[in-house]
């Protein structure tokens, strides 16, 4: 099983983290984004969208971080990470949508400005980041994880860009429930961190 990734991609980190938490064998293949390797013909055969991550499971190719999380949970029968019960499954889908929406256009976008020089309005993306952080803070409340006492792929989908939000000049110090939640994820057996850059508030 190969995971095509880049160490500064939070989307790729989601897949890397979940593979490590599952404890299954895998090989990391770094894609040189700066050199445009993700737009090269060979890579576009794997993912026509030209994005990481991509999982190649002995010829079964899965692109998109959320799709990879779902695939791995189903492949290994890990109903603890992705419950089959209808309400829990729907709640997880909600958070996967948040990861692709509010997280992508909030803390992820804010970090893209500082780390990669992306052309976003800084004030707007930081404001979006704080809106979703406040929502996650309220949703967590006294819960250990997003759905309750145990981590699910919902937590994995949100972790990376929230953990590294300070790199995008997003101050997370006021979100105590979020910070405690991050620490719980980081304490899970098999945890692997998302590479940090000394930029923004993380400098």
UniProtKB/Swiss-Prot annotation:
Keywords: Transferase
Pfam families in UniProt: GST_C_2, GST_N
Residue intervals of the GST C-terminal domain: 85-203
Gene3D superfamilies with a match to the protein in the record: 1.20.1050.10, Glutaredoxin (3.40.30.10)
Organism: Rhizobium leguminosarum
Domain GST N-terminal: 1-80
Similarity-based family: Belongs to the GST superfamily.
Gene: gstA
Protein name stated in the entry: Protein GstA
Record PROSITE patterns: GST_CTER, GST_NTER
UniProt-listed SUPFAM superfamilies: GST C-terminal domain-like (SSF47616), Thioredoxin-like (SSF52833)
Lineage: Bacteria, Pseudomonadati, Pseudomonadota, Alphaproteobacteria, Hyphomicrobiales
GO molecular function terms noted in the UniProt entry: transferase activity
